[in-house]
Amino acid sequence: MASLGPAAAGEQASGAEAEPGPAGPPPPPSPSSLGPLLPLQREPLYNWQATKASLKERFAFLFNSELLSDVRFVLGKGRGAAAAGGPQRIPAHRFVLAAGSAVFDAMFNGGMATTSAEIELPDVEPAAFLALLRFLYSDEVQIGPETVMTTLYTAKKYAVPALEAHCVEFLTKHLRADNAFMLLTQARLFDEPQLASLCLDTIDKSTMDAISAEGFTDIDIDTLCAVLERDTLSIRESRLFGAVVRWAEAECQRQQLPVTFGNKQKVLGKALSLIRFPLMTIEEFAAGPAQSGILSDREVVNLFLHFTVNPKPRVEYIDRPRCCLRGKECCINRFQQVESRWGYSGTSDRIRFTVNRRISIVGFGLYGSIHGPTDYQVNIQIIEYEKKQTLGQNDTGFSCDGTANTFRVMFKEPIEILPNVCYTACATLKGPDSHYGTKGLKKVVHETPAASKTVFFFFSSPGNNNGTSIEDGQIPEIIFYT
């Protein structure tokens, strides 16, 4: 089982400790410490109960002890057993186990109850089983980075949810970017949705660190696809593609396949379709995926056409941005009415704006054709007005249906907007005459129950701007996250 890393080394989680009592006779040596083949010895201990002041102390005294035991478990596989030189025998008490676990209750008292004095557990590691027994006898939790996974498995196997919860809490406490993929794999294996969700959140926030960790190439294909499907990864798509190629090379080795272009494509399967190649720049695509040998010649040509020609041909790959943002998408519209016939001659529609709080803009809503279904070419930009610095842009296109609705045009990555800084929203369209907005608002307030007000102020930009102003024109909507 993989370790949680250096930050967790040597740590253990401890629950309730046994209260000190009067000095009494020492407990008999446990058979697990005597070796696997020695005969059991029950040394009489007179009046040991008098030295234990509480029920908890009395049961804790019986933990891993032959005293009054009526069953033994033989554990013969795993690292713990190997280190001990062979099978280990661990004594226990049927009543205590049945009181703490429905699985043990069925084992000892159910319709097919066993009467055997020794029960073999070949799939359980001794250290994990002792951690389970310690918890059942004393409520004490004793887990560490090297045993937490096997203890979680054992707690689930014997239906002890309280110990499961302690294991998950321990894992959550030690969750970091460099072990997030390893823990995500285990969380999915053990059906721990809360831990899996926390792992995914960590991967979202620190994607580059997470995919650079050794554990990334060890994940299974289903976990890889679950991550690639996410809209919230904070990484450039070209770097994500490089990490996926590394995973494919490791998977070829696991399956004992030659590391060839064809085999990498084979092991990736559906995961390849989840890479969002349209989010790359043409330079990133040319330097990486186009030369990787993983894509077919037809796919490479189609993607190059997508990057270079207008109108852009449809491609098989997702072009939705990975927002790396939390919360709900928001949208404001600055116009109160829609009219017909707004023409385009190559001049950009522009409108300046400020906002009262930090937000991230992910796209615009634009008006489409008055002549029925049509495709438009469009370049969208956000420019910091004072510095004349372009913060983000996208050469893309959109299809409209001839209605007066707005149509979403998205940036490849979210653009951070700072409070009280002036920006210019810019859209350069190529296509037929469109609808346009009128009765524009200088101030638009967006309010949600979960967040404070987001207030936009709009100003006309100097110059022609294709006629767009505060009062009327294009760029009716701004799509953003708070």
Curated annotation (Swiss-Prot):
Ranges where the BTB domain occurs: 69-145
Biased composition (Low complexity): 1-21
Biological process according to GO: muscle organ development; neurogenesis; protein ubiquitination; regulation of protein binding
GO molecular-function terms, A-Z: cullin family protein binding; identical protein binding
Keywords carried by this UniProt record: Cytoplasm, Differentiation, Methylation, Myogenesis, Ubl conjugation pathway
Tissue-by-tissue expression: Ubiquitous; highest levels in testes, heart and skeletal muscle.
Top-level taxon in the UniProt lineage: Eukaryota
Subcellular location: Cytoplasm
SMART domains cross-referenced by the UniProt entry: BACK, BTB
Major place of residence: cytoplasm
Gene3D superfamilies xrefs: 1.25.40.420, PHR domain, Potassium Channel Kv1.1, Chain A
InterPro entries according to UniProt: BACK, BTB/POZ_dom, PHR, PHR_sf, SKP1/BTB/POZ_sf
Entry-annotated residues carrying Omega-N-methylarginine: 79
Pathway note: Protein modification; protein ubiquitination
Compositional bias of kind Pro residues: 22-31
Entry keyword Cytoplasm: yes
UniProt-annotated stretches for the region Disordered: 1-36
GO annotation, cellular component aspect: cytoplasmic ribonucleoprotein granule; cytosol; nucleoplasm; P-body; protein-containing complex
Domain BACK, chain residue ranges per copy: 184-284
Coiled coil start-end: none
Record's function text: Probable substrate-specific adapter of an E3 ubiquitin-protein ligase complex which mediates the ubiquitination and subsequent proteasomal degradation of target proteins. Seems to regulate expression levels and/or subnuclear distribution of TOP1, via an unknown mechanism. May play a role in mesenchymal differentiation where it promotes myogenic differentiation and suppresses adipogenesis.
Record note on quaternary structure: Interacts (via C-terminus) with TOP1. Interacts with TRIM5 isoform Delta. Interacts with CUL3.
Listed name of the protein: BTB/POZ domain-containing protein 1
